[in-house]
From Swiss-Prot:
Protein residues bound to ATP: 66-73
InterPro entries xrefs: AAA+_ATPase, DNA_recomb/repair_RecA, DNA_recomb/repair_RecA_CS, P-loop_NTPase, RecA-like_C, RecA-like_N, RecA_ATP-bd, RecA_C_sf
Source organism of this protein record: Rickettsia conorii (strain ATCC VR-613 / Malish 7)
Protein name: Protein RecA
Gene name linked to the record: recA
Family the UniProt entry places it in: Belongs to the RecA family.
PANTHER family: MITOCHONDRIAL DNA REPAIR PROTEIN RECA HOMOLOG-RELATED (PTHR45900:SF1), RECA (PTHR45900)
NCBIfam families attached to this UniProt entry: tigrfam_recA
Alphabetical keyword list: ATP-binding, Cytoplasm, DNA damage, DNA recombination, DNA repair, DNA-binding, Nucleotide-binding, SOS response
Keyword DNA repair (UniProt): yes
């Protein structure tokens, strides 16, 4: 078959598919109107940089997992606040029945506009999520958490009844159904997940997430969040040092990490990240315990500098802008080097 005949055959096949399934159901990748992936900020400057596109991608499934009290819900509330700032409508499926509206408000969430549901069963939770996503009016939906999505058969059964893999089957079926709607409506769907220990693992990590393997495959981004230390004011613990690792990323190179402080009552400390990343990228100068910006001393000690940046938002925003610009250039250089190595 000659090239001309091949082109004619492909054109005829494409025309037939479009006739059957509608315009835009099949096309060449270069003909797509939006090749760039849109993103919503996570509320953490370091994590936005680690994700490579400035936040979590729209129209994708995201999994955030980690041990208890590691900051999973805090991170998702920051995500909601950032989406709402852009005019987005968000929904929270609270399967754990544990959302604190007062804390959400402190983190910048407009609770008057947040749609919330506290379902009784896993099936009910996922049906509600499916209906909201299909409506095309929701920009972000949070499901907290996969472990709390208890199948109806388990709730109606007796205590101690063996329910082998019923939750994994439920998740697998739901994700098959949800994934096309999520992509079509450009809705960010975030699943919060817990960690369990596998019994009898001799080599490698014994940790695993709940709900089977389906979510691991369907998720475009998987974020592992851990508490690595405490922040103290004299003897009082006022926050926790947190480390996140992007363990899977389909939109940018994976395995990048970010560190930030979660302050009790106010969430992720943006000022702390600006100081740390500013010093790392030589934007902020550090000499002993003194910090300087543009040869002007802005404070002694990290906590004092954080307070200074809170009181001077224009300087904070200026440093953040430079950090984002510098980081994107570094990412582009790294990507170019990787492509050259592959060639």
């Amino acid at each position: 078959m000659s090239n001309t005949d091949k082109e004619r055959a492909i054109a005829a096949a494409l025309a037939q598919i479009e006739k059957s399934y509608g315009k835009g159901s099949v096309m060449k990748l270069g003909q797509r109107p939006h090749v760039d992936i849109e993103a919503v900020s996570t509320g953490s400057l370091g994590l936005d940089i680690a994700l490579g596109i400035g936040g979590v991608p729209k129209g994708r499934i995201i999994e955030i997992f980690g041990p208890e009290s590691s900051g999973k819900t805090t991170l998702t509330l920051h995500l909601i606040a950032e989406a709402q700032k852009k005019g987005g409508t968000c929904a929270f499926i609270d399967a754990e029945h544990a959302l604190d509206p007062a804390y959400a408000k402190k983190l910048g969430v407009n609770i008057d506009e947040l749609i919330i549901s506290q379902p009784d069963t896993g099936e009910q939770a996922l049906e509600i999520a499916d209906t909201l996503i299909r409506s095309s009016g929701i920009d972000m939906i949070i499901i907290d958490s996969v472990a709390a999505l208890v199948p109806k058969s388990e709730i109606e059964g007796e205590m101690g009844d063996a329910q082998m893999a019923s939750q994994a089957r439920l998740m697998s079926q739901a994700l098959r159904k949800l994934t096309a709607s999520i992509n079509r409506t450009n809705c960010i769907t975030v699943f919060i997940n817990q960690i369990r220990m596998k019994i009898g693992v001799m080599f490698g990590s014994p940790e695993t997430t709940t709900g089977g393997n389906a979510l691991k495959f369907y998720a475009s981004v998987r974020i592992d969040i851990r508490r690595i230390g405490s922040i103290k004011d004299k003897e009082e613990v006022i926050g926790s040092q947190t480390k996140v690792k992007v363990v899977k990323n389909k939109v940018s190179p994976p395995f990048k990490t970010a560190d930030f402080d979660i302050m009790y009552g106010s969430g992720i400390s943006k000022e702390g990240e600006i100081i740390d990343l500013g010093v790392k990228l030589d934007i902020v100068e550090k000499s002993g315990s003194w910090f300087s910006y543009k040869n002007v001393r802005i404070g002694q000690g990290r906590e004092n500098v954080k307070q200074y940046l809170k009181e001077h938002p224009q300087i904070s925003n200026e440093i953040e802008k430079i950090i984002r610009e510098k980081s994107s250039k570094i990412t582009n250089i790294n990507l170019d080097q990787t492509e050259e190595e592959n060639d």
